[in-house]
């Protein structure tokens, strides 16, 4: 699905009946996060300069869900970054509709967002996700400390707010440079 299809799905989810009722608050809050990040994120000049040199056609599959807080923070940044890679196409795939995620587990779990970059023949070239290294280290540290889940989420989203997508941009820049030998 493209971004418009995804946002339409999200709108329907906000009306109820698609996800568990307990997800309602997450759906609303994450829509605000998604919209804010999509509106405000701007790629750096370095990313734009490097990404314009990518000529090999690729398809980027982003596995996501509207209820996922990490996805609400990362997917809009990913979409904005992809706008600068002229040879890249993308699609959004819902984690809970289909079995694609089962091929890309993170430590045995279905962590999202997950990004799969494929070549023209459909071969996987790269997989990223569900978080930047820095966000994952924060998550792992808090989890190891046994903090309550709501404290973990507050800390992680506080980190996302301060970072403003720059860690993701930096990681993706390094991956693109390595993948395409730029």
Placement of each model-derived feature along the sequence:
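Short, solvent-exposed coil/turn elements at secondary-structure transition points
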Residues: 66, 96-98
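Active-site rim loops that border cofactor/substrate pockets in soluble metabolic enzymes
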Residues: 89, 99
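Non-globular targeting/processing and membrane-anchoring segments
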Residues: 1-58, 84, 95, 102-111, ...
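A generic structural signal for short coil/turn motifs at secondary-structure boundaries
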Residues: 69, 101-102
């Amino acid at each position: 699905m493209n971004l418009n299809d995804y946002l339409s799905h999200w709108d329907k989810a906000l009306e109820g009946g698609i996800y568990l009722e307990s997800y309602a608050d997450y759906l609303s809050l994450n829509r605000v996060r998604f919209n804010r990040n999509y509106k405000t994120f701007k790629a750096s000049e370095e990313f734009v300069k490097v990404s314009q040199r990518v000529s090999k056609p690729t398809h980027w599959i982003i596995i996501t869900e509207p209820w996922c807080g990490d996805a609400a923070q990362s997917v809009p940044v990913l979409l904005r970054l992809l706008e600068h890679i002229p040879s890249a196409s993308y699609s959004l795939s819902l984690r809970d509709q289909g079995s694609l995620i089962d091929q890309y587990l993170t430590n045995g779990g279905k962590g999202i967002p997950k990004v799969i970059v494929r070549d023209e023949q459909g071969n996987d070239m790269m997989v990223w996700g569900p978080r930047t290294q820095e966000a994952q280290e924060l998550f792992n540290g808090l989890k190891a400390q046994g903090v309550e889940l709501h404290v973990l989420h507050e800390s992680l989203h506080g980190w996302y707010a301060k970072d403003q997508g720059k860690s993701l941009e930096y990681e993706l820049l390094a991956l693109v440079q390595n993948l395409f030998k730029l």
